[in-house]
Amino acid sequence: MGKSSKDKRDIYYRKAKEEGWRARSAFKLIQIDEEYQIFEGVKRVVDLCAAPGSWSQVLSRRIYGDGKDPDVKIVAVDLQEMAPLKGVVQIKGDITKYETSKQIISHFDGSLADLIISDGAPDVTGLHDIDFYGQSQLILSALNITTHTLKIGGTFVAKMFKGDDMSLMYSQMKLFFEHVSFVKPSSSRESSLENFILCRNYQPPLNYNPKIIDPALENHNKILNNNNNNSNNNNNCNIDNENDNEFLKTDSLIVPFIACGDLNLGYHLV
């Protein structure tokens, strides 16, 4: 299906065609960087849900450039293949799988990313609550893999839809980042519910053990049960067991809240 006449009249659509961008969404990332300098000092970047590649294209032009800096490494991840881009390594993978995070780190020679971005979105149904929920789950999946692959102090940017539960999303991100804000670049249509969540200075909770979790959290009771079992067994715990218990205790608080905003656990998060 061809582009609508509305798209063809859009200044950014025309500009994208003129400048050779794969999609008008390239300007959204460019404008976020121009206002917030998210590319400053960045060497290792991950583009999640990257296809068709307009954001990876921005990274290729703005960060990889002429390729003279051997420390610059860009990884694009998507279930779909996309046309090659200069300086961008592509991973055809699922962001909800731990194996994908290991592939990313291997391309960084064991180091972690400075910046992780995601412009992904599920198919829109036109039903606001369903679309907002689907997008929120995609963001949390991106956050899951980010906790495995982003360095302390790093930055995370993701597309989201404006909705009633934005305060919940804000609270979830604030558990991991010092600074969290919602931004809307001028190239994002005013009529669109699209926003971007900008998270800076990654600082995970003390004793948080990164793991890839089911966004629906069907098995989160296993975490709680493991915590209780480890607390009740082995009264003569050694130091290692005590440390393990601290990790489990932290997970039993953080993981349910991140996965679905579950606050019905009888605990405080601080």
Curated annotation (Swiss-Prot):
Name the GO cellular-component terms: cytoplasm; cytosol
Instruction: Write down the EC number.
Output: 2.1.1.205
Q: Its family?
A: Belongs to the class I-like SAM-binding methyltransferase superfamily. RNA methyltransferase RlmE family. TRM7 subfamily.
What job does this protein perform? Methylates the 2'-O-ribose of nucleotides at positions 32 and 34 of the tRNA anticodon loop of substrate tRNAs.
Q: What is this protein called?
A: Putative tRNA (cytidine(32)/guanosine(34)-2'-O)-methyltransferase
One of its GO biological process terms is: neurogenesis
State where the protein is found: Cytoplasm
Q: Where is the active site?
A: K159
Quote the gene name from the UniProt entry. Answer: fsjA
Signal sequence extent: none
What organism does the record attribute this protein to? Dictyostelium discoideum
Under catalytic activity, the entry for this protein gives: cytidine(32)/guanosine(34) in tRNA + 2 S-adenosyl-L-methionine = 2'-O-methylcytidine(32)/2'-O-methylguanosine(34) in tRNA + 2 S-adenosyl-L-homocysteine + 2 H(+)
The question of whether rRNA-binding is a record keyword is answered with: no
Name of the top EC class for this enzyme: transferase
- Using the UniProt record, give the first listed, main subcellular location: cytoplasm
Keyword tRNA processing found: yes
The UniProt keyword set, sorted, is: Cytoplasm, Methyltransferase, S-adenosyl-L-methionine, Transferase, tRNA processing
One Pfam match:
FtsJ
InterPro entries with a match to the protein in the record:
RNA_methyltr_E_TRM7, RNA_methyltr_RlmE, RNA_MeTrfase_FtsJ_dom, rRNA-MeTfrase_E, SAM-dependent_MTases_sf
Q: Where does S-adenosyl-L-methionine bind?
A: G53, W55, D78, D94, D119
Q: Which GO terms describe its molecular function?
A: S-adenosyl-L-methionine binding; tRNA (cytidine(32)/guanosine(34)-2'-O)-methyltransferase activity; tRNA (guanine) methyltransferase activity; tRNA methyltransferase activity
